Amino acid sequence: MSNAYEEYMRQMVIPMRQELVRSGFEELTTEEAVTEFMENTSGTTLVVVNSVCGCAAGLARPSAGQAVVRAEKQPDHLVTVFAGQDKDATAKMREYFGEIPPSSPSMALLKGKEVVHFIHRHEIEGATMDEIITNLEQAFEKNC
């Protein structure tokens, strides 16, 4: 049984989840869903590690959504895991990131299971939305 805090957090993050879903991202909320996706998917995938922090709200989520709308070349798949909320799913996805340290929010572009581009939280916090969008568009152009 969950406590009041956990229920409050589940309700609070609904709009944060929906922002990426409305942009075409598939939520992976369990370890099994991550494994199923990663083991049965080919091509390129943009993974957004979502978060409740301000830089996720003001920069990461809107930048990811705009980049996939604006880019000429786009990843084959768009998925998201939610750090701090879907802990098992996030931990499982991070296993596929190899030696890259945990960072949330963050964005990873994968070819198959290989990370070919990664944007850490500190790169999101210190950037404008346009800089993040350009960063993603360039990664898409090179890898998709």
Curated annotation (Swiss-Prot):
Domain of life: Bacteria
Biological processes, Gene Ontology terms: cell redox homeostasis
Any Pfam family: Disulph_isomer
InterPro entries per record: BrxB/BrxA
Signal peptide range: none
UniProt family annotation: Belongs to the bacilliredoxin family.
Matches recorded under NCBIfam families: YphP_YqiW
Protein name: Bacilliredoxin BC_2157
Lineage: Bacteria, Bacillati, Bacillota, Bacilli, Bacillales
